[in-house]
């Protein structure tokens, strides 16, 4: 069964400026638990460009602390990327209140993102790498992915339709490519500018995707993300 990763307060932060009350987050986590969601990405943990943004854009350990006792089996995490990553912000899983980190890897930063993934795994975190703008990855990017010797440490390798250019018929070519490169778990992050978020995600699920991303009411950057209610209806 495919796992669900909710990123309402991370990707939805583009609409809400990453400012949420503890009460809202707690209520949201209860909703996710009730719907058998496996992962909640509650914000970014970014080091740069933080001025004027809410606390879930920085989302250091103390921001996540209030939710440690209510999440139960739900895994909580954050996203970072190569440009905004500060290793000192990640103190190690044993001293942190998040379970996983997802690293956004733009096509020209794949090698650096994989190195960060290794560092975070060695600190005890579960680690995802998300390949952004997947249709523009070049030969060097694919070579780095193929040659990387620590593929097995990833919870999953995500590919993202960052600019909502993919159609359902195109999902398989990327999914199968990453399988050939040697990645066991492959996941998909949709955007909905063209109205294909659900269809593209279902195409990935039918191929055997480890997880797909959702938000409540489809909130997210630009055209938004896959609405969790649409996915749950389709899976049921």
Across the structure, where does each feature detected by a protein language model lie?
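N-terminal small/glycine-rich loop or linker at the start of catalytic domains
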Residues: 1-17, 73, 96, 126-132, ...
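Core alpha/beta catalytic barrel or barrel-like domain that forms the active/cofactor pocket
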Residues: 2, 7, 42-43, 77-81, ...
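Short, small-residue-enriched loops and turns at beta-alpha junctions
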Residues: 11-16, 48-53, 83-87, 106-110, ...
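Glycine-rich anion/phosphate-binding loops
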Residues: 17-27, 105-112
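Active-site beta->alpha loop and helix N-cap motifs at the rims of alpha/beta catalytic domains
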Residues: 33, 39, 44-144
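Glycine-enriched alpha-helix->loop->beta-strand junction motifs that scaffold or abut catalytic
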Residues: 36, 72-73, 95-100, 121-126, ...
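Catalytic cores of alpha/beta
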Residues: 86-94, 137-151, 195-209
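Catalytic alpha/beta core domains of metabolic enzymes, predominantly
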Residues: 156-236
